[in-house]
Every structure is written in structure tokens, then in C-alpha cells.
Amino acid sequence: MRVQNSRTNESAYKWEEIMKKNILATVAMVAAMGVASAAQATELRLSHQWSNKDIRHQVAQIVADGVAEANVDLDIKIFGSKSLFKPREQYRPLSRGQLDMTVLPLSYAGGQQPAFNLTLMPGLVKNHDHAARLSKSPYMEALEAKMAEDDVMVLVHGYLAGGFVGKDKCITGPADVDGLQTRAAGKAFEQMLAGANASITSMASSEIYNAMQTGILNAANTSSSSFVSYRIYEQVACYTPATEDFALWFMYQPLLMNKSTFEGLSADQQNALLAAAEKAEAFYLEEAKKQDAASVKVFQDAGVEIASMSAEDFDAWRALAQETSYKLFVADVPDGQDLLDMALAVE
């Protein structure tokens, strides 16, 4: 009986050991599957220069959230507030595949592609709906072809309107910038302002606050959104905003992606990105329309004087632009006249 009990105990022990090994093997297999699944998930890095309250961050977040909800093993990590690249240095790494996505004022890349300077041409865009039509026109297709040469594609189209600020006085017409140290966002605006005898200091909109504070700048123009995001109302005496009637300053600020990176994704991942981008683009247009009026309230609440551009002021700026920015663009860009004509043809 003792021998039998010993054998029974030995069998039970062996069975217990076998079960332990099976359980451990199962746990290891599940863990390995989890690691494999995580390894299959693709992470994309998206860079921009604004805070997480800015409309352009919100556009990026809509795309990131939409892709996450699609559950296609694709994650978009957003690096805002110029934490990954300096604002004017994002297009080149994007084109080289060192950066996956960015929300960028395209005229910042005018050094790489001079045609991009047309995306901030004074008086070219009439209003937000006109901007949306430009984004769907042969003119934009021509610009997208140039982006494709750099291995870049557009995911989300978007234009923002903007205005002027003066540190010590209001700016409505060309005579008001005579002798002022002024910031403009792109080459075409710089050329126009130089034609009005302003001195030009080039910088990203994220640098306007410090430049105003230290006396480097007397005046600046940028988008209504950036004026608020960067708290420029703390440094100026007067704000001339864009209105429904007169918006001299309209800037194309799309969400871009490296083309090869997009093409390397699965069909499900590509479709998820495009669906999220479509939703973000609709949001961008509707919110962009609200930014101008919202910025006026912020500046008013801060005690800043609000000035208005008259029809005569607008016409004077546009006449100056045609003699400076427009002529120089056509002279500097080989197909500049064709691109300008395509843009002007959009009703």
C-alpha cells in the first residue's frame, strides 16, 4: 500500500509539473502575441509650432483621434509648440522622411519651392469660401504637383485670415508702415511692405511676442489665430483685423505628410487617414471663419484699440502689391505667370 501511495503521489507531482509548464507556455505565447501586435503598430510623428489651444493643433488632433478610433494599428504622436523642429525648418525634414507630418504655413518653404510664396500673396484671396475654392482648383493641383516633387502630399487643406498690429499706432494703409520695423510671414508680403518703405525683419510668428517686447519690431502681420495663441495683445496698442469685407492677409496652412510614408501604409491605414483628414478639413474651414471675430474680442478685452481698413486702404495695398509682390513673383518663378493666372481665375 505504501508503494502504491508513493507511485500515486509521484504521478500527481508529474501531472502538476506538466500543467505548470503548459500554463507558463500559454502565458509566454500571449505575451509574445502582445509584443508582436505592438511591434506592428506604426507611429507617425507630427510637428507644429502652436499651443494645444490653437485651431491648427485641433486640426492635427482630429486626424490623430480619427486614426486611433479606426483601430488600424496606426498612432499619430503630436509634437506642438515647436518642440520637435523650429517652425521654418519643418518642410525639409518632412521631404526627406525624417518627419512624417506637419501643419505648416506653406510659404515658410518658399526657399525650397519659390512657387509656394503664392500661398501668401496680398489680396489674392477674397474670403474663407473663396479660399476653400482655391484649395480645390487647378491652381492648387499645380502646387501639389510641386510638393510631390519633394515627396510631400496634402492631407488637410486650410487657409487662415489675418491682419496687422502696431506697437505704438494703428496700421490701415501703406503710409502707416513707412519707417517701421515690420514682420511679415512670407516673401510676397515682405516685398509689398518694403515697397511701402517698411524695414523687414523675418521670423516665425512664435517669435513676434519677444521681438515686440524687446523693441525689435514696431509692427507685424500674421493670422488671427496666431495673434491670440501667442498673446500679441499684451504687446501692442492697435489691431487691424481681417473682416468679411477686407482681408488683405490670407495664408495657406495645410496639414502635410511625407508621400512615401503614406504610400508605405496599409490600405486600411491610408483610408483611416483620409477619412479623418476629410473631417478635419471641414472643421478647419468652419472654425477659420470664426477666428477673426473671436480675435477682435480678445484684443478688445485686453484694452487694445481696434482699427478698420477702408475700401481705399485695401485698394492702395493691392495696387502696391501688384507693383511689387506680383511682378517679382512672376519674374522670380519660371512658371509664375501661369500659376498666378490660375489663382486669379478662381471665382
What kind of region is each of these model predictions?
Residues 8-11, 26-27, 51:
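A periodicity- and composition-biased signal for non-globular, repetitive helical segments
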Residues 1-18:
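Short, Lys/Arg-enriched N-terminal segments with co-localized hydrophobic residues
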Residues 19-40:
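Gram-negative bacterial Sec-dependent N-terminal signal peptides
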